[in-house]
Amino acid sequence: MKVAVLGAAGGIGQALALLLKLQLPAGTDLSLYDIAPVTPGVAVDVSHIPTAVNVKGFSGEDPTPALEGADVVLISAGVARKPGMDRSDLFNINAGIVRGLIEKVAVTCPKACVGIITNPVNTTVAIAAEVLKKAGVYDKRKLFGVTTLDVLRSETFVAELKGLNVSRTSVPVIGGHSGVTILPLLSQVQYAKWNEDEIEPLTKRIQNAGTEVLNAKAGGGSATLSMAQAAARFARSLVKGLSGETVVECTYVEGDGKYARFFSQPVRLGKEGVEEILPIGPLSNFEQQALENMLPTLRADIELGEKFING
């Protein structure tokens, strides 16, 4: 099994490289790529950690050598948010970066499962889909927006608020990966009883958690470490699924289009990537209203990505 990280010299990428070296199954090949010349050095650095994961690093304009034979590709390349920016401000720079990398994926490893980390995910996943479609290699079972950080944050905040064991706390998060499109289904959390006045503030905290980190870092960075752990968890789940295990994760994929062309919800992962998109289950009145309110934003984000490729 080979996992490639594109954008491996960045704040998320370096932390992700470290976590994958520690967490991927023995015998996995880990391929690190970034345009920055430091990338082979990042690979040497993590290669000194004693685990049975083999690491190679590549830099320069062309990611092809890093992508050859990849089963899983994680894309974290691009610019990060700074204070005062929202994820859509990143669009103009990151859209072109994702397009260029996906064009290489389409040629070099068209059957790989691709996880998009680069923001704005609501839009960059649509860009990736349209590039793969133009190349004639799009398989909607193999393209994912990595929204796992919303799940991690929800699990953490719910466990803190309710005094639950965080390792046993599971919170499905549906919708998209920015602002109002992030919808944690708090009504589905086991062993948590909610007061009406808790739901809305907690939902807003989860939706704005990225900004919480931005402000706390006082202009010195965005949520890189928690994002890296979220991406590592998703990568591990993909690898398990590809190896024949049954794993369920919330992730942003193209489904039946009931809510939007791309939508994050629980997905059963398997040997072909998406094995089954699971139902979102019963919603509270608050969640139902929040879902209806987010859809115009989510659909507009997706359309922006489609138009970027198709004009």
UniProtKB/Swiss-Prot annotation:
Q: Which reaction does it catalyse?
A: (S)-malate + NAD(+) = oxaloacetate + NADH + H(+)
GO MF term list: L-malate dehydrogenase (NAD+) activity
Matching InterPro entries: L-lactate/malate_DH, Lactate/malate_DH_C, Lactate/malate_DH_N, Lactate_DH/Glyco_Ohase_4_C, Malate_DH_AS, Malate_DH_type1, Malate_DH_type1_bac, NAD(P)-bd_dom_sf
- Which biological processes are named by the entry's GO terms? malate metabolic process; tricarboxylic acid cycle
Q: Which UniProt keywords apply?
A: NAD, Oxidoreductase, Tricarboxylic acid cycle
Phylogenetic lineage:
Bacteria, Pseudomonadati, Pseudomonadota, Gammaproteobacteria, Pasteurellales
Q: Which domain of life is it from?
A: Bacteria
Binding, substrate: R81, R87, N119, R153
- The EC number(s) attached to this protein equal 1.1.1.37
The family database entries (PROSITE patterns) matched by this protein are listed as:
MDH
Q: What is this protein called?
A: Malate dehydrogenase
The record describes its quaternary structure and partners as: Homodimer.
* Entry's Gene Ontology cellular component terms: cytoplasm
- Describe the family membership recorded for this protein in Swiss-Prot or TrEMBL: Belongs to the LDH/MDH superfamily. MDH type 1 family.
Give the active-site positions. Answer: H177 (proton acceptor)
* Role description: Catalyzes the reversible oxidation of malate to oxaloacetate.
Entry-linked Pfam families: Ldh_1_C (PF02866), Ldh_1_N (PF00056)
Gene3D superfamilies (alphabetical): Lactate dehydrogenase/glycoside hydrolase, family 4, C-terminal (3.90.110.10), NAD(P)-binding Rossmann-like Domain (3.40.50.720)
Give me the residues that bind NAD(+), please: G7, A8, A9, G10, G11, I12, G13, D34, N94, I117, T118, N119, M227
